[in-house]
Amino acid sequence: MVRKIITYPNPRLFLNSEIVNKFDTELHTLLDDMYETMIASNGVGLAAIQVDIPLRVLLVNIFDENDEQKKEDLLEIINPEIIPLDEEMITCTEGCLSVPDFFEEVKRYNHILLKYQDRFGEFKELEAKGFLAVAIQHENDHLNGHLFIEKISFAKRQKFDKEFKKKKKNHKKEK
């Protein structure tokens, strides 16, 4: 089932998500719904808080070298812990399903170790580089109540705030 994605400035986006302790059918349904929601929204990642569920659950499904997004490449990440493996940073243009129509460059670690649990509670580790590492860090920020717009420069944040207010004003006029 496709769920509704909550968008900025909804205060629930700024909640810290809770650790998952039950790896049951309810969690599996959430993961399946999140995948359907992410694909229907043309996303490469989604955190549970974005569908208004404050649990430490996220999905990442980036496009492969053939520009295809395959379900077998889907990462279901529960209770993640991210460890930078070096100090090298990478700058990528990021967007967010909870901050629609805004894209900006953000610096993040280029090489990380991800420790997490899968849908069955099994502990896993994954070394990630480049865009995969960036996508994981972006989604993990959601679990800690942060959005990518908090990582942009002051000037770019002012630009975002101005565009957001203008869009909100135009939306009210349309109603």
From Swiss-Prot:
Which cofactors is this protein said to need?
Fe(2+)
User: GO MF terms on file?
Assistant: metal ion binding; peptide deformylase activity
Record protein name field: Peptide deformylase
The protein's matches in HAMAP family, at most eight in alphabetical order, are given as:
Pep_deformylase
Q: Which residues bind Fe cation?
A: 96, 138, 142
Q: Would you identify the family this protein belongs to, as annotated? A: Belongs to the polypeptide deformylase family.
- Source organism: Campylobacter jejuni subsp. jejuni serotype O:2 (strain ATCC 700819 / NCTC 11168)
Presence of the UniProt keyword Metal-binding in the record: yes
Enzyme class, broadest EC rank: hydrolase
Keywords (alphabetical) are: Hydrolase, Iron, Metal-binding, Protein biosynthesis
Q: Which gene encodes it?
A: def
Look up the domain of life of the source.
Bacteria
